[in-house]
């Protein structure tokens, strides 16, 4: 069965890649990071050239509302699961105060998990792989049989730019359920070669922290995701750093539980319990323009005030029964 999956996977990857090749934008393959990254590009072109698959960062989280710090709506709290669902795995909003303990996912390998009282703000997904990332999270709602760990591994494969055609058979099968052939072909084209040992050390020579730490984690994940026998726990230790998180460059003091005012007119806040589970609270005031609009969790990245911590994309899958 695994061999059959591999043959079909390789076949449609090859066909779709040929069809889509002419549509690839040159600008998506070129370019580079500014500042110190440009200076290092000759040393580590594969690691640093071009945009990361997901670029969402703290400057994109522009909707925090400090005036609502300490505020709790008077409405009785209800489960988001009581609202009408959408084909995207989202929810049709109605006036009221809602909560859901959701499955959330790490989008920044080589950084620290939630903790230390740091707050999180709303920002939308941005970057070359935003479409694929949102598709995985949205489509996972219709596939409850897929384990959260496997969804996280697919997202790490995208972030680390692993070759999807080289993934373990089970992950390939999962990818085929959640992504289109065109999306898979695009991800395969943007993949990087796996490096380890002295080759990895040489490639990272001269790269400063924290860029080195992130690039090293991504390189290790690329190798592990395509190596039979690598366990989820081993990959998690690479992607999610333990210990106290120092303040990252450009960090802001954001208290835990700060509300963000979504552009659609509702308030949202995120309170993570580790990277894989987040308490999402939504308040839709009476008369809000958000009434009747969709809350699509896949369009929500919870961005920490401490840039050394992980960005967490939300999902419409409950972590536990609501």
Stretch-by-stretch model annotation:
Residues 97-228:
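Mature extracellular/secreted ectodomains of secretory-pathway proteins
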Residues 37-157, 254, 275, 284-313:
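Short, surface-exposed polybasic-aromatic patches that bind anionic ligands, especially phosphate groups
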Residues 28-29:
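Boundary of Sec targeting at the N-terminus
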Residues 32-36:
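Extended, helix-rich scaffolding/adaptor regions
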Residues 73-74, 81, 91-93, 99-101, ...:
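Long, low-hydrophobicity ectodomains and other hydrophilic envelope-associated domains
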Residues 11-22:
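Bacterial N-terminal signal peptides
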Residues 2-13:
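Bacterial N-terminal signal peptides that target proteins for export
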């Amino acid at each position: 069965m695994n061999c059959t999956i591999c043959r079909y996977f390789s076949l449609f990857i090859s066909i779709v890649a040929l069809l889509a090749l002419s549509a690839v934008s040159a600008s998506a393959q070129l370019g580079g990071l500014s500042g110190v990254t440009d200076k290092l590009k000759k040393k580590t072109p594969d690691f640093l050239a071009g945009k990361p698959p997901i670029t969402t960062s703290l400057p994109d989280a522009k909707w925090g509302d400090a005036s609502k710090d300490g505020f709790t709506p008077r409405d009785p709290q209800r489960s988001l699961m009581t609202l009408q669902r959408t084909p995207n795995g989202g929810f049709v909003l109605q006036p009221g105060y809602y909560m859901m303990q959701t499955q959330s996912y790490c989008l920044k390998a080589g950084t620290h998990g939630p903790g230390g009282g740091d707050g999180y703000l709303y920002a939308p997904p941005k970057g070359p792989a935003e479409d694929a990332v949102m598709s995985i999270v949205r489509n996972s709602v219709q596939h409850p049989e897929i384990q959260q760990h496997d969804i996280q591994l697919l997202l790490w494969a995208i972030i680390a730019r692993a070759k999807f055609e080289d993934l373990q058979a089970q992950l390939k099968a999962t990818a085929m359920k959640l992504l289109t052939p065109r999306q898979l072909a695009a991800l395969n084209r943007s993949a990087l070669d796996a490096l380890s040992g002295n080759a990895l050390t040489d490639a990272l020579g001269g790269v400063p922290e924290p860029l080195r730490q992130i690039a090293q984690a991504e390189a290790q994940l690329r190798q592990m995701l395509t190596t039979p026998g690598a366990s989820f726990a081993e990959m998690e230790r690479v992607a999610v750093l333990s210990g106290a998180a120092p303040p990252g460059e450009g960090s802001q003091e954001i208290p835990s539980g700060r509300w963000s005012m979504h552009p659609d007119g509702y308030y949202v806040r995120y309170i993570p319990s580790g990277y894989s589970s987040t308490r999402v609270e939504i308040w839709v005031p009476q008369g809000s323009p958000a009434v009747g609009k969709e809350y699509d969790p896949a369009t929500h990245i919870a961005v920490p005030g401490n840039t050394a911590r992980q960005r967490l994309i939300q999902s419409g899958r409950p972590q536990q029964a609501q």
